Protein backbone atom coordinates (compact mmCIF):
# COMPACT_ATOMS: atom_id res chain seq x y z
CA UNK A 1 0.00 0.00 0.00
CA UNK A 2 1.03 3.62 -0.34
CA UNK A 3 3.05 4.52 2.77
CA UNK A 4 0.82 7.47 3.69
CA UNK A 5 -2.30 5.28 3.57
CA UNK A 6 -1.04 2.60 5.96
CA UNK A 7 -2.48 4.06 9.20
CA UNK A 8 -5.97 4.31 7.69
CA UNK A 9 -5.75 0.73 6.40
CA UNK A 10 -4.70 -0.69 9.75
CA UNK A 11 -8.27 -1.28 10.95
CA UNK A 12 -8.96 -3.64 8.05
CA UNK A 13 -5.57 -5.28 7.66
CA UNK A 14 -4.90 -6.39 11.25
CA UNK A 15 -1.22 -5.40 11.20
CA UNK A 16 0.94 -2.85 9.40
CA UNK A 17 4.54 -1.69 9.21
CA UNK A 18 4.29 2.10 9.41
CA UNK A 19 6.83 4.91 9.26
CA UNK A 20 6.70 6.98 12.45
CA UNK A 21 6.03 10.12 10.40
CA UNK A 22 2.70 8.71 9.19
CA UNK A 23 1.95 7.15 12.56
CA UNK A 24 2.25 10.55 14.25
CA UNK A 25 -0.01 12.16 11.63
CA UNK A 26 -2.63 9.48 12.35
CA UNK A 27 -2.57 10.14 16.08
CA UNK A 28 -0.45 7.11 16.96
CA UNK A 29 2.46 7.29 19.38
CA UNK A 30 5.24 5.17 17.84
CA UNK A 31 6.92 4.57 21.18
CA UNK A 32 3.74 3.62 23.08
CA UNK A 33 1.44 2.18 20.40
CA UNK A 34 3.73 -0.01 18.30
CA UNK A 35 4.37 -3.69 18.95
CA UNK A 36 7.95 -3.04 17.94
CA UNK A 37 9.88 0.06 16.95
CA UNK A 38 12.90 -0.12 14.70
CA UNK A 39 16.31 0.69 16.12
CA UNK A 40 18.75 3.16 14.62
CA UNK A 41 18.63 2.89 10.83
CA UNK A 42 21.26 5.27 9.51
CA UNK A 43 20.83 4.10 5.90
CA UNK A 44 17.29 5.45 6.11
CA UNK A 45 18.06 8.78 7.73
CA UNK A 46 16.07 11.64 6.21
CA UNK A 47 18.28 13.94 4.21
CA UNK A 48 18.56 17.44 2.83
CA UNK A 49 18.68 17.01 -0.96
CA UNK A 50 19.60 19.48 -3.69
CA UNK A 51 20.20 19.48 -7.42
CA UNK A 52 23.64 18.23 -8.33
CA UNK A 53 26.02 21.16 -8.79
CA UNK A 54 24.46 23.35 -6.10
CA UNK A 55 25.90 21.48 -3.10
CA UNK A 56 28.52 24.11 -2.36
CA UNK A 57 26.49 27.26 -2.84
CA UNK A 58 26.31 29.56 0.16
CA UNK A 59 22.54 29.16 0.38
CA UNK A 60 22.75 25.38 0.65
CA UNK A 61 25.63 25.46 3.11
CA UNK A 62 23.82 27.99 5.31
CA UNK A 63 20.67 25.85 5.29
CA UNK A 64 22.64 22.72 6.14
CA UNK A 65 24.37 24.51 9.02
CA UNK A 66 21.03 25.66 10.41
CA UNK A 67 19.64 22.12 10.32
CA UNK A 68 22.73 20.88 12.15
CA UNK A 69 22.40 23.48 14.90
CA UNK A 70 22.03 22.60 18.56
CA UNK A 71 18.70 24.42 18.49
CA UNK A 72 17.29 22.05 15.86
CA UNK A 73 18.78 18.93 17.46
CA UNK A 74 17.26 19.82 20.83
CA UNK A 75 13.89 20.50 19.22
CA UNK A 76 13.82 17.10 17.49
CA UNK A 77 14.81 15.15 20.57
CA UNK A 78 12.45 17.00 22.91
CA UNK A 79 9.45 17.35 20.58
CA UNK A 80 9.23 13.78 19.27
CA UNK A 81 10.46 11.77 22.27
CA UNK A 82 12.12 8.98 20.31
CA UNK A 83 9.65 8.66 17.46
CA UNK A 84 11.86 10.98 15.39
CA UNK A 85 15.56 11.01 16.22
CA UNK A 86 18.32 13.44 15.26
CA UNK A 87 21.36 11.86 13.58
CA UNK A 88 23.52 14.98 13.89
CA UNK A 89 26.43 13.87 16.07
CA UNK A 90 28.23 17.21 16.45
CA UNK A 91 25.67 20.02 16.65
CA UNK A 92 26.90 23.53 15.94
CA UNK A 93 25.71 27.06 16.58
CA UNK A 94 24.16 27.00 13.11
CA UNK A 95 26.90 29.11 11.56
CA UNK A 96 29.22 27.99 8.75
CA UNK A 97 32.40 30.08 8.65
CA UNK A 98 32.86 29.41 4.93
CA UNK A 99 29.56 31.09 4.03
CA UNK A 100 29.34 34.75 2.99
CA UNK A 101 26.38 35.61 5.20
CA UNK A 102 26.57 39.30 4.25
CA UNK A 103 25.77 38.36 0.65
CA UNK A 104 22.85 36.20 1.81
CA UNK A 105 21.36 38.90 4.04
CA UNK A 106 17.91 39.78 2.75
CA UNK A 107 17.63 36.70 0.53
CA UNK A 108 15.19 33.79 0.67
CA UNK A 109 16.02 30.09 0.64
CA UNK A 110 13.15 27.80 -0.39
CA UNK A 111 12.74 24.18 0.65
CA UNK A 112 10.11 21.61 -0.35
CA UNK A 113 9.09 19.43 2.59
CA UNK A 114 6.55 17.05 4.06
CA UNK A 115 4.37 18.72 6.71
CA UNK A 116 5.36 16.46 9.62
CA UNK A 117 8.00 16.40 10.94
CA UNK A 118 10.06 18.02 8.19
CA UNK A 119 8.28 21.38 7.89
CA UNK A 120 8.12 21.61 11.69
CA UNK A 121 11.87 21.05 11.93
CA UNK A 122 12.54 23.54 9.14
CA UNK A 123 10.57 26.19 11.02
CA UNK A 124 13.14 25.90 13.81
CA UNK A 125 15.96 26.21 11.27
CA UNK A 126 14.12 29.28 9.96
CA UNK A 127 14.71 30.97 13.32
CA UNK A 128 18.43 30.17 13.11
CA UNK A 129 18.72 31.59 9.59
CA UNK A 130 16.73 34.69 10.54
CA UNK A 131 19.56 35.64 12.90
CA UNK A 132 21.71 36.09 9.77
CA UNK A 133 19.02 38.06 7.91
CA UNK A 134 18.01 35.08 5.75
CA UNK A 135 14.39 34.11 5.20
CA UNK A 136 13.47 30.44 4.85
CA UNK A 137 10.39 29.63 2.79
CA UNK A 138 8.99 26.17 3.54
CA UNK A 139 6.84 24.79 0.71
CA UNK A 140 4.76 21.85 1.94
CA UNK A 141 3.86 18.83 -0.20
CA UNK A 142 1.76 15.82 0.73
CA UNK A 143 3.27 13.48 -1.88
CA UNK A 144 6.73 12.01 -2.50
CA UNK A 145 7.12 13.00 -6.16
CA UNK A 146 6.60 16.75 -6.51
CA UNK A 147 9.30 17.76 -3.97
CA UNK A 148 11.96 16.11 -6.10
CA UNK A 149 10.57 17.48 -9.36
CA UNK A 150 10.46 21.09 -8.15
CA UNK A 151 14.01 20.73 -6.81
CA UNK A 152 15.20 19.31 -10.11
CA UNK A 153 13.68 22.16 -12.13
CA UNK A 154 14.95 24.87 -9.78
CA UNK A 155 11.64 26.02 -8.34
CA UNK A 156 13.07 25.46 -4.86
CA UNK A 157 16.63 25.36 -3.56
CA UNK A 158 16.36 22.05 -1.73
CA UNK A 159 14.02 19.45 -0.35
CA UNK A 160 13.75 17.61 2.94
CA UNK A 161 11.41 14.62 3.08
CA UNK A 162 13.20 11.43 2.01
CA UNK A 163 16.03 9.02 2.74
CA UNK A 164 18.94 8.14 0.44
CA UNK A 165 17.61 4.77 -0.82
CA UNK A 166 14.40 6.49 -1.96
CA UNK A 167 16.38 9.33 -3.57
CA UNK A 168 18.63 6.90 -5.45
CA UNK A 169 15.62 4.95 -6.70
CA UNK A 170 13.83 8.16 -7.74
CA UNK A 171 16.87 9.42 -9.68
CA UNK A 172 17.20 6.12 -11.51
CA UNK A 173 13.52 5.92 -12.43
CA UNK A 174 13.03 9.58 -13.36
CA UNK A 175 16.37 10.72 -14.75
CA UNK A 176 16.73 13.41 -12.10
CA UNK A 177 20.06 14.64 -10.75
CA UNK A 178 19.56 15.14 -7.03
CA UNK A 179 22.13 14.53 -4.31
CA UNK A 180 22.21 14.44 -0.54
CA UNK A 181 24.13 17.11 1.33
CA UNK A 182 23.57 15.66 4.78
CA UNK A 183 21.41 13.54 7.05
CA UNK A 184 19.19 15.25 9.63
CA UNK A 185 16.99 12.67 11.35
CA UNK A 186 15.52 9.22 11.03
CA UNK A 187 11.97 8.00 11.52
CA UNK A 188 11.90 4.43 12.82
CA UNK A 189 9.45 1.96 11.35
CA UNK A 190 7.05 0.33 13.77
CA UNK A 191 4.85 -2.74 13.63
CA UNK A 192 1.29 -1.88 14.66
CA UNK A 193 -1.66 -4.17 15.37
CA UNK A 194 -5.32 -4.00 16.33
CA UNK A 195 -5.90 -4.97 19.94
CA UNK A 196 -2.51 -6.68 20.24
CA UNK A 197 0.12 -5.35 22.61
CA UNK A 198 2.87 -7.94 22.22
CA UNK A 199 4.54 -9.14 19.04
CA UNK A 200 4.45 -12.75 20.25
CA UNK A 201 0.64 -12.58 20.11
CA UNK A 202 0.63 -11.82 16.39
CA UNK A 203 -1.73 -14.47 14.99
CA UNK A 204 -0.74 -16.94 12.29
CA UNK A 205 -2.60 -16.29 9.07
CA UNK A 206 -2.81 -12.59 9.82
CA UNK A 207 -2.36 -9.99 7.11
CA UNK A 208 0.54 -7.58 7.48
CA UNK A 209 0.54 -4.59 5.14
CA UNK A 210 3.77 -2.83 4.22
CA UNK A 211 4.78 0.17 2.06
CA UNK A 212 4.59 -0.38 -1.69
CA UNK A 213 7.55 1.72 -2.87
CA UNK A 214 10.73 -0.26 -3.49
CA UNK A 215 13.02 1.20 -0.83
CA UNK A 216 10.51 1.13 2.01
CA UNK A 217 9.20 -2.31 1.02
CA UNK A 218 12.75 -3.60 1.35
CA UNK A 219 13.16 -1.90 4.71
CA UNK A 220 9.89 -3.34 6.03
CA UNK A 221 10.70 -6.87 4.88
CA UNK A 222 14.10 -6.83 6.55
CA UNK A 223 12.46 -5.60 9.76
CA UNK A 224 9.96 -8.48 9.63
CA UNK A 225 12.81 -10.92 9.03
CA UNK A 226 14.79 -9.42 11.91
CA UNK A 227 11.88 -10.25 14.21
CA UNK A 228 11.62 -13.82 12.89
CA UNK A 229 8.26 -13.30 11.21
CA UNK A 230 9.44 -14.10 7.68
CA UNK A 231 12.54 -15.47 5.96
CA UNK A 232 14.31 -13.89 3.00
CA UNK A 233 16.99 -15.58 0.86
CA UNK A 234 20.41 -15.86 2.49
CA UNK A 235 21.88 -13.63 -0.21
CA UNK A 236 19.18 -10.94 0.11
CA UNK A 237 20.79 -7.51 -0.12
CA UNK A 238 19.02 -4.40 1.17
CA UNK A 239 21.08 -2.24 -1.18
CA UNK A 240 19.76 -4.16 -4.19
CA UNK A 241 16.22 -4.36 -2.82
CA UNK A 242 13.79 -7.18 -2.16
CA UNK A 243 10.05 -7.62 -2.59
CA UNK A 244 7.35 -9.91 -1.25
CA UNK A 245 8.12 -12.21 -4.19
CA UNK A 246 11.51 -12.93 -2.61
CA UNK A 247 10.07 -14.29 0.66
CA UNK A 248 11.11 -17.93 1.08
CA UNK A 249 9.15 -18.51 4.30
CA UNK A 250 6.17 -16.31 5.12
CA UNK A 251 5.85 -17.67 8.65
CA UNK A 252 2.16 -18.29 8.05
CA UNK A 253 1.42 -14.58 7.54
CA UNK A 254 -0.14 -12.90 4.52
Label the model's feature ranges:
Residues 104-116, 134-140, 207-208:
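Short, well-ordered beta-strand elements
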Residues 44-62, 188-200:
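A bilobed periplasmic-binding-protein/Venus flytrap-type ligand-binding module shared by bacterial periplasmic
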Residues 12, 16, 20-53:
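A C-terminal functional module that forms or caps the active site or interfaces directly
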Residues 70, 181-231:
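A conserved helix-loop-strand patch within extracytoplasmic ligand-binding domains
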Residues 25-37, 169-181, 196:
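Ligand-binding "clamshell"
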Amino acid sequence: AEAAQLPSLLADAEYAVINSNYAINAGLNPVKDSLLIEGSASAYANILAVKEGTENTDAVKALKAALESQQVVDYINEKYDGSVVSVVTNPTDGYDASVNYDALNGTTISVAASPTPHAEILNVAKEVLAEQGIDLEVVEFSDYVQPNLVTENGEVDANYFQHTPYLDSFNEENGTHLVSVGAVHYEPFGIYGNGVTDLKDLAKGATIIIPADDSNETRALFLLQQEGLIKLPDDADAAKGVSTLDIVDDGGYN
